[in-house]
Amino acid sequence: MKLQDSLRKIIRQSGSGRWVQGSGAVQGACDTLPGDPGAGGSPFLMKLLAAAVLLAGGLASGCASDASSGEQNPSLAAEAAESVSENQKSGIRSGGAAGSPSYARAKGNAKLTIWVADYQGYNGIAKVGERFTRDTGVKVNVVHYGQADVQFQYASAAGVAPDIFLSGHDRFGEWAKEGLIAQLAPGAEEKARFTGLAWDAVTIGGKIYGYPMGIWALGLICNRKLVPDAPENWEDFIALDNKLQKKGVRAIYWDYTTPYYTYPLISANGGYSFKKASDGFYDTGKTGVANEGAKSGLKFLIDLIWNGHMRKGADYGVMQQEFSGGRLGCILDGPWSWAGYDQAGIDFSVNRLPKLNGMRSRPFVSVQSFVISASSPNRDLAVDFLENYLLTDDGIRDVNDDVAIGVPALRSFQALSGRNSRIAATMENVRGGDLIPSIPEMYRFWSAFQTALREAVTGRQGADEALEDAAKGIAKQ
């Protein structure tokens, strides 16, 4: 059935097609996360929005491109649907292996489609895909999106998901619950090749749902020319800013109204999102976003801003621009940004996050991992590609040479990267960080904490009141 027919069928089932009018669905796909307030959460609306989004050519050309050719892809929905159709004809089913009859029939006939975000080294993945094609005859199509997680969830609901998808682990719990991603069964030898932390991130309820690649955590990134020695304490930035302002430069800036970036300040003295209970599951009825440690962190941020040591108005793009232009001493950013600062000609260091009140900041830790769509008829091919081609020293090198993957989850490549000071510093931040809980309730945390940050830094609410309101919203059942 064509995707257009699928949309018509869904509309007929609903009795109304009014939800797919104008360009609202397209805009929402790029800018709104499923589960956020106003995004719509029912299975029917998800499927309807998915079909509408994927049918819209404007979204495909505006949010994604074909990594293989570097050209804009006019219809990713058609590409995905074609891939599913071709692979179904090949007779590939889950549970096969290289050398099995189903695998043999796939050669020269099937196609693996891989979706990644714009910042995730798609050129390197495409390079590995070319080797896989030469060896097996199976075509590999690598597609990249601006809002990749959003597109994956919509495409899964519409039945046109890619075979493989690269994402941070924090959505896996939700996707596993919704049946969007396949449970995996790597052998003991395969598991031994990766760090335990990486497997912990992709394990939901004792079951594995992803193959880990790189581990991300924020670091304190400093321009060596302006700040030869990175500050050890957050409090040190006050004197440093007084000094650098005389040169027309600011000491520190980051996207401080985005929870991911400001979490290190509230976590330094004991703030947290959710903690695991004794049964191994997160206690979502309790949050540490409003404890005394969290409040002290937010108050310090407010003081930095209102005492003139950090510009008013948080903007990630402005931060990148100012740092790339040599007008910022230090920023908070992650491995995905390193290549851009290198290209800008900035000699920078990556350092451990500073201490606040003598306690080390704890960043959120994200494990970038590959999942296999539950609807993919090519799980055996996908596993072969991931285990024997991409997640090897040669494969990871190709991806890392394109865009830094952070701390390698692959032990052997981690050993090869041991002398890299950026990776070493990121490793320290990872070890001292908090793994992002892979639970749907994190939406409450992101939303409520962001509101608290915006209210507090603008003075509309005090730090205590803003965080206490956030805690009520986060811990609601």
Where on the chain are the PLM-derived regions?
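Conserved N-terminal structural module of periplasmic/extracytoplasmic solute-binding proteins
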Residues: K2-Q4, R8-R12, A52, G57, ...
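Short, solvent-exposed loop/beta-turn-alpha elements that line the ligand-binding surface or hinge
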Residues: S102-A106, P186-F194, Y272-S296, Q343, ...
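Hinge/lid segment of periplasmic solute-binding proteins
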Residues: V84-G108, H169-G219, D229, W234-D241, ...
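Extracytoplasmic "Venus flytrap"/periplasmic binding protein-like
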Residues: K127-F194, Y209, R224-P228, E232, ...
